């Protein structure tokens, strides 16, 4: 099948979702040669991946991932402003590859959101776009990445947050590692990570490295049945909601996709320079995460609050972004968010 798929894609013809599923199953079963894999993902990149193609690939990766089973039968009753719903699982994740070298914003947000009563399955890896990926900073915060799926499940169920280390849970990806490394360009695999959470997170805030991906990835999330989510791209290049200017965004719901723009001012924040959000290596970024969760004021706190507000809205923990920002601030100022780091470190060691 992959030879026929390559022949079709080099003629700039799209694959159906079913065809993509067939090809991805071949790749992840080890049935394709490195040359075939490299040719296929390069041709797909040159043509441009469609929603159907990305969705098909994501379905296969989800099916082949080691599952993380999280209890969803608990009702969150600490809400009086929205309807009660079955407990949701949230992921706050970026594609990486934005090249901005900011501190670990989505990881910091994950601790805050979990302190607000939302179960967070943080899916991540080592560095892509900076000197420090989510896995790198978590190690320096004392979190053990070498844990079993059962330990990850226990973390999420008991303290509300667990880290899903992608290489440990996507074993079938090993067949694509060599071709990806050797061709050295961004391919469909660079955008599949945020779509393939092994805990089947049904709510999500996803950052992407190019604005053209906002609507496309939102379309994929909608197609894959995301309960509620936001796809964002800071127009300064960040794969987060930025404080330096505007953010292109899409809201995903069962009804469809809504495109809109976010500005810091609409939520009471001042714009800042990119320099104010810069990070460093894993040791430096771990210190920044602790400082922000310890109550340090300034742009780092504000960008984390803004992103957390949208994450809490996606998870149904609040009715508005403004209410989510208030909840996030309370989680920091009470010490609850910082305590989540210690709980996760203790439970994984």
Swiss-Prot record:
Q: State where Mg(2+) 2 binds.
A: 239-240
What Enzyme Commission number does this protein have? 2.4.2.18
Alphabetized InterPro entries for the sequence: Anthranilate_Pribosyl_Tfrase (IPR005940), Glycosyl_Trfase_fam3 (IPR000312), Glycosyl_Trfase_fam3_N_dom (IPR017459), Glycosyl_Trfase_fam3_N_dom_sf (IPR036320), Nuc_phospho_transferase (IPR035902)
| Pfam families xrefs | Glycos_trans_3N, Glycos_transf_3
Q: Does the keyword Membrane apply?
A: no
- What pathway annotation does it carry? Amino-acid biosynthesis; L-tryptophan biosynthesis; L-tryptophan from chorismate: step 2/5
Q: Which reaction does it catalyse?
A: N-(5-phospho-beta-D-ribosyl)anthranilate + diphosphate = 5-phospho-alpha-D-ribose 1-diphosphate + anthranilate
Q: Which UniProt keywords apply?
A: Amino-acid biosynthesis, Aromatic amino acid biosynthesis, Glycosyltransferase, Magnesium, Metal-binding, Transferase, Tryptophan biosynthesis
Q: Which GO terms describe its biological process?
A: L-tryptophan biosynthetic process
> GO cellular component annotations, sorted alphabetically?
cytosol
Q: Which GO terms describe its molecular function?
A: anthranilate phosphoribosyltransferase activity; magnesium ion binding
* Protein residues bound to anthranilate 1: 94, 125
Q: Which residues form a coiled coil?
A: none
Query: Per UniProt, where does anthranilate 2 bind?
Result: 180
Q: Which residues bind Mg(2+) 1?
A: 106, 240
> What does the cofactor section's free text say about binding?
Binds 2 magnesium ions per monomer.
Which co-factor is required?
Answer: Mg(2+)
List of residues binding 5-phospho-alpha-D-ribose 1-diphosphate:
94, 97-98, 102, 104-107, 122-130, 134
**What function is annotated for this protein?**
Catalyzes the transfer of the phosphoribosyl group of 5-phosphorylribose-1-pyrophosphate (PRPP) to anthranilate to yield N-(5'-phosphoribosyl)-anthranilate (PRA).
Q: Which family does it belong to?
A: Belongs to the anthranilate phosphoribosyltransferase family.
Q: What is this protein called?
A: Anthranilate phosphoribosyltransferase
The gene coding this protein: trpD
